[in-house]
Curated annotation (Swiss-Prot):
InterPro entries linked: LCN-type_CS_alpha_beta_dom, Scorpion_toxin-like, Scorpion_toxin-like_sf, Scorpion_toxinL, Scorpion_toxinL/defensin
Tissue expr: Expressed by the venom gland.
Protein name as annotated: Delta-buthitoxin-Hj1a
Organismal lineage: Eukaryota, Metazoa, Ecdysozoa, Arthropoda, Chelicerata
Cysteine pairings via disulfide bonds: C14-C65, C18-C38, C24-C48, C28-C50
SUPFAM superfamilies to which the protein is assigned, alphabetical: Scorpion toxin-like
Organism: Hottentotta judaicus
Molecular function (Gene Ontology), one example: sodium channel inhibitor activity
Length: 66
């Protein structure tokens, strides 16, 4: 399966906000990624970034979280 590095998304194009790398690492691995970290996302906070996340998993795309 193809993979990519990206911000993993919840339903409705919303990111997973975070404070700790360990939270994102566990979340990303649970969704099939190699690893994850808590990265700067916008001025409103940080979000989980996954490394080698399977293409079948949703990622943050341009547009609002709704």
């Amino acid at each position: 399966e193809e993979v990519r590095d990206a911000y993993i998304a919840q339903p409705h194009n919303c990111v997973y906000h975070c404070f700790r790398d360990s939270y994102c690492n566990d979340l990303c691995i649970k969704h099939g990624a190699e690893s994850g970290e808590c990265k700067w996302f916008t001025s409103s906070g940080n979000a989980c970034w996954c490394v080698k996340l399977p293409k079948s998993e949703p990622i943050k795309v341009p547009g609002k979280c709704h």
